[in-house]
């Protein structure tokens, strides 16, 4: 035992060169065998070598907390704190300690909330990622089983197959060579062939083959682990961070402009005293900075990410949520996503090509060329046709099994029968099997005719071949291949696929089918699912030998308008995504295999479907834990809701910055009104506490793909902010310069105190600003009238509590240090009424802004539309053009002559493409309908009629 421990210690200290010694010495050095380790021995080694994962840097909690105070928005607040304690120390007054303490308190509160929420989000993310932890097939206690890769130890026997990411450094055992992609480690672009005895590194990907291996190094002792210590992590600035920075910079610049104007006017022109001027500058600094913005947006995404995981979509990076919200094209695999991937074979339809052979023999040969364990869907379907799965190996001894790979597209079994003769059977893609057949020229036409016959019924074809191997060795080429027969495979569509596709089209997401099957199969599936039949063979569009008949047509247009692609190879997926992105589409791509990884990485949202390989999961942004398309569409809706919350807040934040800067700047410059900085702090603290609840607000997702439109955010914020600033200016003028409020409501006048120190007027302005500022969130969060869309209960409760506190402060507070005095309940009621009256136009302003930004207002001017245009005629030309275009492009490879209407914005392009797809889908559905009711509904949808205005009666 002691000798064994010493040997393992030597392995741990890397004094033994396990990479280069003969494989038998590896077993001797690791004190293990080809039968694997026992669980007890593995546990002992785990304690010695540690877990098979890289050590994570432990970050100081305190430094992490302080980190939330180190960003541009916090710097502005910290500058305000320095101003309050240093620059404010003048004019015969002591330093502004209360403002200094208030600012520091606000910073600490915000950082604390950020720290707690991010910590919770981090724990939740860690729990989610644990579900995606890489697995390894390992031999323990004489049995193969799937275990977490983290518990592997040197001496374990593992199995590496196509699509696996190698879980640890290992030496390969006997068998056929593997193709290993080491590009992530060495930069080599082409896969490397690795045979028995060769070493494979942790982190590389198996591109072809299947082989067992013995683990020689784990965790930090692997080649990848050592390299990771030498490389510093790079901070990639994502799009979300860029948006956050842009909005923060806009707010900072707005404050800077306001402060410069105040300094220029107050001191050289108005000759104001030093200290009041500093106080006015502090008001702009403290009130204008959206200090809670990073926290609110990060928390919103973290909570949203958790909700997505509950729906079966785990986000590997939270910023994928914004891309998901903006996705307008989804390229979806047919098999397993649109269909069940539960194949069935109709034995009566099997076509036999060799004399003296019946359908049962073809089935048996196909079963022999299948796996009995770790089966894929095809193997399971074929072996399941036998009365007993053991028949597939009855009376034969397996010599060698060739697993499926994307290049050969077939499996093969070499075996010895009871007479000692060697044979080989193979099943796979008909074209590949046909290439093997010795009589290809004689049977090719019939084979293609049968394939086409199957395809017209939506059936895939599987070919079976047989040969004798007289040489008696597994490496020998063998005798001539006999083409035995063709088997039809049916993969039924999911029960919810058709409805989900219709939902997707209604959401502005154009679903394109991606299938490796024949064009006829793709079209038949598209017809059954109601997604249209405007499909093309990808090789004709993107292959090296393009179809001459479409060579002159614009390929990008055909790809953009297509409902799907057939005969797709992995490299075609990448090209399809690339061309769609070049047309400014936000493209999602589903995938499951190792060869899908490049396309998944290229796509804006790479989606690894349920049961995807490790390589596909590694390359994706979102990993599905449930099969089917409905999970993706539900994730789109949830992502849009999350994005809507973030956009609502950013518009609110910009609006508040403008209203504070413009409003208080005008009060200070026109009437020389000095609002106390401490009260702006109170507004900020109450606002931040309330606005945190927006991360769980009830929102209505956008009906179309959404994205960050900074011009819309800034324009809306400036208009809202300017309107609210003028509300405050008008209120101040009415309360200070007129007797309107005392005369109308019988409240006391504020004019007398105004000549002294503005204390009561300051309380009134504080309450007016506090109420309308927080109420604005109800306007920005809704797409229609704010009082129609019910907000989340948390937001309502937070608003009521915050404004109750604000009202009590304004009514009762007599704070000399803050220069305010209670105004009583009468004035509080007047201010609430004033804000309610001026709140109502905010919704109208919102609609006008949206209308102006959409460009439709300018379209009406340009096209000289008049008010007397009838509703049924409005847009008639566009509908007719769309109808004609859909009819022209439904069949064949015809490119559109021109765009249907002048597209002035990317938004219009997205909705147009989705609208066309909806029409093609409705045409496909029309063919399936045999009732008068269904026919009428389809025609109504196709022609864009308003069903509500048509009085019709029909019977089914």
Swiss-Prot record:
Q: Where are the transmembrane segments?
A: 66-85, 98-118, 248-268, 278-295, 648-669, 675-697, 714-734, 760-780, 793-813, 822-842
Keyword annotations from UniProtKB, A to Z: ATP-binding, Hydrogen ion transport, Ion transport, Magnesium, Membrane, Metal-binding, Nucleotide-binding, Phosphoprotein, Translocase, Transmembrane, Transmembrane helix, Transport
Q: Name one Pfam family in it.
A: Cation_ATPase_N
EC number(s) recorded for this UniProt protein: 7.1.2.1
Annotated catalytic residues: 333
Q: Which Gene3D superfamilies match?
A: 6.10.140.890, Calcium-transporting ATPase, cytoplasmic domain N (3.40.1110.10), Calcium-transporting ATPase, cytoplasmic transduction domain A (2.70.150.10), Calcium-transporting ATPase, transmembrane domain (1.20.1110.10), HAD superfamily/HAD-like (3.40.50.1000)
UniProt protein name = ATPase 11, plasma membrane-type
Species, as recorded: Arabidopsis thaliana
High-level lineage: Eukaryota, Viridiplantae, Streptophyta, Embryophyta, Tracheophyta
Q: Which gene encodes it?
A: AHA11
